[in-house]
Amino acid sequence: MEQVRVILANIERMKYEPEEVLGEILPYYAEKYTRYKREEDARQELVCGILLRKYLGVWKTGQVGYGKDGKPFLLERQWKYNLSHSGVWVVLGISDAEIGVDIERIRRYHSATARKLFTEEEQVMLEQVESEEARNALFTRLWTEWEAVLKLEGSGFAGGWRENGVDKARYAIWTKEMDGYFLSAATRDATLICLVEDEQRRKC
Protein backbone atom coordinates (compact mmCIF):
# COMPACT_ATOMS: atom_id res chain seq x y z
CA MET A 1 0.00 0.00 0.00
CA GLU A 2 1.30 3.43 -0.91
CA GLN A 3 2.18 5.97 1.76
CA VAL A 4 0.52 9.31 1.03
CA ARG A 5 0.39 12.64 2.82
CA VAL A 6 -1.65 15.57 1.56
CA ILE A 7 -0.64 18.87 3.15
CA LEU A 8 -2.99 21.86 3.02
CA ALA A 9 -1.79 25.41 3.60
CA ASN A 10 -3.91 28.56 3.71
CA ILE A 11 -2.07 31.53 2.21
CA GLU A 12 -4.00 33.92 4.46
CA ARG A 13 -2.56 32.33 7.61
CA MET A 14 1.12 33.00 6.98
CA LYS A 15 2.76 33.93 10.28
CA TYR A 16 5.83 35.66 8.83
CA GLU A 17 6.83 38.14 6.17
CA PRO A 18 7.75 36.89 2.66
CA GLU A 19 11.17 38.54 2.90
CA GLU A 20 12.03 36.14 5.72
CA VAL A 21 11.86 33.09 3.46
CA LEU A 22 12.56 34.19 -0.12
CA GLY A 23 16.22 33.19 0.20
CA GLU A 24 15.33 29.83 1.75
CA ILE A 25 13.04 28.38 -0.92
CA LEU A 26 13.50 27.02 -4.44
CA PRO A 27 14.51 29.95 -6.70
CA TYR A 28 11.78 28.97 -9.18
CA TYR A 29 9.09 29.91 -6.64
CA ALA A 30 10.95 32.91 -5.24
CA GLU A 31 11.19 34.36 -8.75
CA LYS A 32 7.51 33.72 -9.45
CA TYR A 33 6.59 35.42 -6.18
CA THR A 34 8.51 38.57 -7.08
CA ARG A 35 7.22 38.56 -10.68
CA TYR A 36 3.50 38.16 -10.01
CA LYS A 37 1.58 41.39 -9.47
CA ARG A 38 -1.62 39.91 -8.04
CA GLU A 39 -1.10 39.23 -4.34
CA GLU A 40 -3.07 35.97 -4.26
CA ASP A 41 -1.06 34.52 -7.16
CA ALA A 42 2.23 35.63 -5.61
CA ARG A 43 1.40 34.16 -2.21
CA GLN A 44 0.38 30.85 -3.76
CA GLU A 45 3.81 30.51 -5.37
CA LEU A 46 5.59 31.54 -2.18
CA VAL A 47 3.73 28.93 -0.12
CA CYS A 48 4.51 26.25 -2.73
CA GLY A 49 8.19 26.93 -2.13
CA ILE A 50 7.74 26.99 1.64
CA LEU A 51 5.98 23.61 1.69
CA LEU A 52 8.66 21.98 -0.47
CA ARG A 53 11.37 23.24 1.88
CA LYS A 54 9.49 22.39 5.04
CA TYR A 55 8.30 18.88 4.19
CA LEU A 56 10.83 17.63 1.63
CA GLY A 57 13.92 19.74 2.30
CA VAL A 58 13.86 21.05 -1.27
CA TRP A 59 15.23 24.55 -1.76
CA LYS A 60 18.05 24.27 -4.32
CA THR A 61 17.56 24.12 -8.10
CA GLY A 62 19.83 21.06 -8.34
CA GLN A 63 17.49 19.01 -6.16
CA VAL A 64 14.72 18.89 -8.78
CA GLY A 65 14.54 17.43 -12.28
CA TYR A 66 11.77 17.55 -14.87
CA GLY A 67 10.12 14.83 -16.96
CA LYS A 68 9.39 15.08 -20.68
CA ASP A 69 6.01 16.68 -19.95
CA GLY A 70 7.49 19.11 -17.43
CA LYS A 71 6.46 17.25 -14.27
CA PRO A 72 9.04 17.90 -11.52
CA PHE A 73 10.65 15.11 -9.51
CA LEU A 74 13.25 14.83 -6.77
CA LEU A 75 16.69 13.82 -7.99
CA GLU A 76 18.09 12.32 -4.79
CA ARG A 77 15.11 11.09 -2.76
CA GLN A 78 12.57 8.31 -3.20
CA TRP A 79 9.54 10.48 -2.52
CA LYS A 80 7.26 11.72 -5.30
CA TYR A 81 5.35 14.95 -4.98
CA ASN A 82 2.77 17.11 -6.69
CA LEU A 83 1.52 20.64 -6.03
CA SER A 84 -1.73 22.48 -6.70
CA HIS A 85 -3.26 25.78 -5.66
CA SER A 86 -6.53 27.64 -5.97
CA GLY A 87 -7.79 30.70 -4.13
CA VAL A 88 -6.51 30.68 -0.55
CA TRP A 89 -5.29 27.06 -0.61
CA VAL A 90 -2.02 25.42 -1.61
CA VAL A 91 -1.76 21.61 -1.59
CA LEU A 92 1.33 19.41 -1.52
CA GLY A 93 0.90 15.67 -2.10
CA ILE A 94 3.78 13.40 -1.04
CA SER A 95 3.98 9.68 -1.75
CA ASP A 96 6.44 6.83 -2.21
CA ALA A 97 4.85 6.30 -5.66
CA GLU A 98 3.56 8.65 -8.36
CA ILE A 99 0.83 11.01 -7.16
CA GLY A 100 -1.32 13.76 -8.60
CA VAL A 101 -3.26 16.37 -6.62
CA ASP A 102 -5.66 19.13 -7.61
CA ILE A 103 -7.66 21.69 -5.70
CA GLU A 104 -10.23 24.00 -7.30
CA ARG A 105 -12.65 26.60 -6.06
CA ILE A 106 -16.15 25.47 -7.05
CA ARG A 107 -16.77 26.73 -10.58
CA ARG A 108 -19.82 27.09 -12.76
CA TYR A 109 -20.87 24.11 -14.86
CA HIS A 110 -20.00 24.55 -18.53
CA SER A 111 -21.61 22.04 -20.88
CA ALA A 112 -19.11 22.47 -23.74
CA THR A 113 -16.21 21.87 -21.34
CA ALA A 114 -17.93 18.81 -19.91
CA ARG A 115 -18.43 17.34 -23.39
CA LYS A 116 -14.80 17.95 -24.25
CA LEU A 117 -13.23 16.63 -21.05
CA PHE A 118 -15.51 14.13 -19.33
CA THR A 119 -16.73 10.65 -20.19
CA GLU A 120 -20.23 10.09 -21.56
CA GLU A 121 -21.29 8.57 -18.25
CA GLU A 122 -20.05 11.65 -16.37
CA GLN A 123 -21.85 13.95 -18.79
CA VAL A 124 -25.11 12.09 -18.16
CA MET A 125 -24.56 12.39 -14.40
CA LEU A 126 -24.17 16.15 -14.76
CA GLU A 127 -27.26 16.53 -16.95
CA GLN A 128 -29.39 14.61 -14.45
CA VAL A 129 -28.55 16.91 -11.55
CA GLU A 130 -31.49 19.25 -11.00
CA SER A 131 -30.09 22.13 -8.96
CA GLU A 132 -27.49 24.54 -10.33
CA GLU A 133 -25.53 24.47 -7.08
CA ALA A 134 -25.28 20.67 -7.07
CA ARG A 135 -24.33 20.61 -10.77
CA ASN A 136 -21.55 23.14 -10.18
CA ALA A 137 -20.24 21.05 -7.30
CA LEU A 138 -20.27 17.82 -9.32
CA PHE A 139 -18.63 19.53 -12.29
CA THR A 140 -15.81 20.77 -10.05
CA ARG A 141 -15.39 17.42 -8.31
CA LEU A 142 -15.06 15.60 -11.63
CA TRP A 143 -12.64 18.25 -12.85
CA THR A 144 -10.33 17.80 -9.84
CA GLU A 145 -10.47 14.01 -10.10
CA TRP A 146 -9.45 14.09 -13.74
CA GLU A 147 -6.81 16.74 -13.18
CA ALA A 148 -5.27 14.71 -10.34
CA VAL A 149 -5.10 11.60 -12.53
CA LEU A 150 -3.58 13.46 -15.46
CA LYS A 151 -1.05 15.23 -13.22
CA LEU A 152 -0.04 11.83 -11.86
CA GLU A 153 0.71 10.83 -15.43
CA GLY A 154 2.65 14.06 -15.99
CA SER A 155 0.24 15.66 -18.43
CA GLY A 156 -2.99 17.64 -18.30
CA PHE A 157 -6.23 18.10 -20.17
CA ALA A 158 -4.26 19.41 -23.15
CA GLY A 159 -1.85 16.47 -23.15
CA GLY A 160 -3.67 14.11 -25.51
CA TRP A 161 -5.08 12.03 -22.68
CA ARG A 162 -7.94 10.60 -24.75
CA GLU A 163 -5.52 9.42 -27.43
CA ASN A 164 -3.36 7.81 -24.73
CA GLY A 165 -6.31 5.84 -23.38
CA VAL A 166 -6.28 7.20 -19.83
CA ASP A 167 -9.04 5.46 -17.85
CA LYS A 168 -9.89 7.17 -14.57
CA ALA A 169 -11.42 3.97 -13.22
CA ARG A 170 -7.96 2.37 -13.05
CA TYR A 171 -6.77 4.80 -10.39
CA ALA A 172 -7.43 5.18 -6.68
CA ILE A 173 -8.94 8.64 -6.22
CA TRP A 174 -9.63 10.37 -2.92
CA THR A 175 -11.80 13.50 -2.94
CA LYS A 176 -12.82 15.97 -0.25
CA GLU A 177 -15.20 18.94 -0.35
CA MET A 178 -14.15 21.83 1.86
CA ASP A 179 -15.75 25.28 2.20
CA GLY A 180 -16.35 26.05 -1.46
CA TYR A 181 -13.48 23.94 -2.82
CA PHE A 182 -12.87 20.38 -3.98
CA LEU A 183 -9.58 18.59 -3.36
CA SER A 184 -8.62 15.34 -5.11
CA ALA A 185 -5.58 13.08 -4.90
CA ALA A 186 -4.86 10.22 -7.30
CA THR A 187 -2.55 7.21 -6.97
CA ARG A 188 -2.25 3.99 -8.93
CA ASP A 189 -3.05 1.74 -5.99
CA ALA A 190 -5.49 1.89 -3.10
CA THR A 191 -4.02 3.83 -0.22
CA LEU A 192 -4.75 5.59 3.04
CA ILE A 193 -4.53 9.37 2.83
CA CYS A 194 -3.09 11.32 5.74
CA LEU A 195 -4.49 14.87 5.47
CA VAL A 196 -2.48 17.52 7.31
CA GLU A 197 -3.28 21.22 7.57
CA ASP A 198 -0.04 23.18 7.83
CA GLU A 199 -0.24 25.76 10.61
CA GLN A 200 2.67 27.83 9.24
CA ARG A 201 3.84 28.73 12.71
CA ARG A 202 7.50 28.41 11.86
CA LYS A 203 9.73 29.11 8.92
CA CYS A 204 11.05 26.54 6.42
Walk through the language-model features, giving the residues of each.
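Core catalytic alpha/beta fold that binds nucleotide/phospho-ligands
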Residues: 1-204
